[in-house]
Structure formats: C-alpha cells, structure tokens
Design a protein with these regions (language model features):
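Generic signal for short, ordered secondary-structure residues
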Residues: 1-2, 33
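Terminal "cap-and-tail" regions of soluble proteins that handle hydrophobic small molecules
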Residues: 2-9, 13-14, 92-103, 109-180
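Short, well-ordered alpha-helical segments enriched in acidic and aromatic residues
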Residues: 18-34
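A solvent-exposed, acidic/Ser-Thr-rich amphipathic alpha-helical stretch
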Residues: 29-88, 180
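Short, surface-exposed linear patches
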Residues: 54-57, 70, 93, 108-112
Length: 180
C-alpha cells in the first residue's frame, strides 16, 4: 500500500521527469483533477477525470512544453495514513521553445484512498506563474537544483533565491503565513 507521501512523490517524479508510467503509483484509476488558474501566463483544463487524461494533462503535454522541471511541496510531508493534505508548492522550469524560465506557485489539495493510499482527487491552484528571460534560466536552475527535493522548507527556498524582481510576488506568496 502507498502512503500519502509516496503518492505525492511519485506524482512529482512522473511530472518533473516526463514519466507517465509512474502515475499508477500515485493516482487511483478513477482519480479526479481540478485546476484553478489565477494567472493568464499558463492554461490547463479546469476538470479532468481518470488517470489516462490526467497523465495527458500533467505529464505528456506538460513535458512537450517544459523541461528542467523542479516541483517542490513546501513544508513537511503528510502523515503516512493521511486522507487529506494541503501544501503550498513552487515550480521552476524552462520553456523548450523559447528558452524562457518559469517560476510558479500555488496550493495542492490532496485526497487519498484509505485502502490504497493513492490520490483520489487533486486540486491544483496556480496563484502565480512568472516568465523570465532565457538569460535567467541558469540562475533559476542553480537555485532550484540546490534545494531539498521534493519537500522543501519555505525559509530555505527564500534564503537561496536569486535577487530577481520578477520573483517578488512568488516569494511573498510562498512565505506568507496564511491558512491554506
């Protein structure tokens, strides 16, 4: 049986590494994905049902557009038998076509099966998705590649963040002490 933490980690490994075959170690076959996007710089369908379509959206199509993907869950992982879990997240990546860097953040809301530990429902809220010039890719990748992965404390993230004005809203969001 999976644990909540392992299911989350397998999802991140699948998405970041463009490995859709790993999703069956993260999601139930009839899982549901809801996307809430509060930015115009990236788009996703608002509702997806089933592991196949979820894989198309979160791994296959995502992997066609982005590379050098690092996704972080901020804070401590869930308890092994957790039925629900919420955390802020941060992603750093680069666009395959333009070479531009992307840094985004938001909230994950997970619901897990009591029997299998697999994800039954995931709501991903995207609060910010910043686009930076290709000249910033190196410093963004240097930053994110040195963070604890995939579980990272917000303080560590901020202490090592590059001094780029475009990132201010992202840094403020992930460090804000607000209830999720």
């Amino acid at each position: 049986m999976n644990t909540a933490q392992l299911s989350i980690q397998q999802y991140i490994k699948a998405k970041d590494g463009n490995r859709p075959y790993l999703l069956d170690q993260a999601f139930a076959s009839d899982a549901v994905l809801d996307m809430v996007v509060h930015t115009g710089s990236i788009s996703f369908p608002p509702h997806v049902e089933g592991i196949g379509p979820i894989g198309d959206v979160l791994v296959r199509r995502f992997g066609q557009t982005f590379e050098n993907v690092y996704t972080f869950c901020l804070g401590l992982p869930p308890e092994p038998q957790a039925r629900t879990f919420q955390c802020k997240w941060l992603v750093g990546m680069s666009d395959k076509s333009s070479g531009e860097a992307r840094v985004g953040c938001g909230v994950y809301e997970w619901q897990f099966s009591a029997e299998s530990g697999l994800v039954e429902r995931l709501t991903i809220t995207i609060e910010h998705m910043k686009t930076l010039p290709a000249s910033d890719v190196h410093c963004i990748m240097k930053w994110v590649s040195h963070l604890d992965y995939p579980w990272c404390h917000p303080e560590a993230l901020v202490n090592n963040s590059p001094d780029i004005g475009t990132l201010e809203e992202v840094i403020q969001y992930v460090t804000a002490d607000t209830a999720i």
